[in-house]
Amino acid sequence: VNKLHVKGLDLVRSNFPKAMGELLKSVLEDILANVPKDKIDERIINFKESMKLVDFDRIAMPTGVKNMKKYSAGKNGNFTQFAKGAPAHVKAAITYNDLLEHFGVSGKYEKISNSEKIKWVYLRQNEFGLDSCGYKGYEDPTEVIDFIKQYIDHKKMYAQMLEKKIMMFYESLKWNQPVNKKTSMERFF
């Protein structure tokens, strides 16, 4: 039985989304097994297109959060303004806390605090102008989870979390970016 033992790559890190880690592992296994590039491209394109069907929790970024006060620059209405240079995951944690207040459930649910482990996602354009949102992964209010499900930005999650990692493999093999043959052929007709 051939078994792949990987160390040092994002696909095995605990702070990398599960579904994306599984894809990277299968891509790496395919590369090592000399699977043709077009088959690997197909796997990647299929994953990218099916991300909307994957449970958001499997593509959310797990991380620890700290320095929340440092990056809070006061409130503008219901939502916190962020200090320059605030990391996306810190913004996401603060946004979760703001949403607890906005939805009127801050008395029922604990806010995210420094040194907690959270998961977070990028958001598409929404009525509050929020870029990202975190959650605890347990005892989260349905209002926040529904908001995340409605506005999760799958394209940005793919671009920020996965595309660069895939391109590291591809560039080292002198391969071009994965191409969806179906849509690229349709352009000619």
Residue ranges and their predicted role:
Residues 1-189:
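DNA-dependent DNA polymerase catalytic subunits
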